[in-house]
Amino acid sequence: MTTIVSVRRNGQVVIGGDGQATLGNTVMKGNVKKVRRLYNDKVIAGFAGGTADAFTLFELFERKLEMHQGHLVKAAVELAKDWRTDRMLRKLEALLAVADENASLIITGNGDVIQPENDLIAIGSGGPYAQAAARALLENTDIGARDIVEKALGIAGDICIYTNHNLTIEELSSKA
């Protein structure tokens, strides 16, 4: 698995992820880029789960963004509908964390589109560790979104054997 974290604070939204890819209990690659920019750099997205599955979902999600002129929520709902109802897509095993200047969402293969409390997203095998760390930092410090993401991923990388310290981090200005 992996760890993906998204934090929104003080006019910034940041998504970061580690770079480890495993096959069973063997590390196959340590520098996978699991976070990327989509739709003319107006959306950032990260994935946890199967790499090939996630790349397929990124492509489909970008098409949905194009169809809906970059409207994140509409594109996410349409992707989730297709993911849940299409026989081939249903077999894809991944979670997506996506954000634009207005919203942060989790998209699942069960057809769920979730806007989490406090715009804090943490998915993947190290998600619970990263979420706890990020939440503590959000509630008890004034540090910026990028620093929170970096620290949360660092803690997850120290604890979760499926998460490393090779990070990819993307950020956008936020209205929320």
Swiss-Prot record:
Active-site residues, record numbering mapped to chain: T2
Pfam name, any one: Proteasome
Binding annotation for Na(+): G157, C160, T163
InterPro entries (UniProt xref): ATP-dep_Prtase_HsIV_su, Ntn_hydrolases_N, Proteasome_sua/b, Proteasome_suB-type
Molecular function GO labels: metal ion binding; threonine-type endopeptidase activity
Assigned keywords, A-Z: Allosteric enzyme, Cytoplasm, Hydrolase, Metal-binding, Protease, Sodium, Threonine protease
GO cellular component terms given for this protein: HslUV protease complex; proteasome core complex
Enzyme Commission number(s) of this protein: 3.4.25.2
Location, primary (coarse class): cytoplasm
GO biological process: one example: proteolysis involved in protein catabolic process
Reaction(s) this enzyme catalyzes, per UniProt: ATP-dependent cleavage of peptide bonds with broad specificity
Cross-referenced CDD domains: protease_HslV
Mechanisms controlling activity: Allosterically activated by HslU binding.
Compartments where found: Cytoplasm
Claim: Metal-binding is one of the keywords in the record: yes
Biological role: Protease subunit of a proteasome-like degradation complex believed to be a general protein degrading machinery.
Family named by the database record: Belongs to the peptidase T1B family. HslV subfamily.
Oligomer status and interactors: A double ring-shaped homohexamer of HslV is capped on each side by a ring-shaped HslU homohexamer. The assembly of the HslU/HslV complex is dependent on binding of ATP.
Protein name, UniProt field: ATP-dependent protease subunit HslV
Organism, as annotated: Erwinia tasmaniensis (strain DSM 17950 / CFBP 7177 / CIP 109463 / NCPPB 4357 / Et1/99)
Gene that this polypeptide is encoded by: hslV
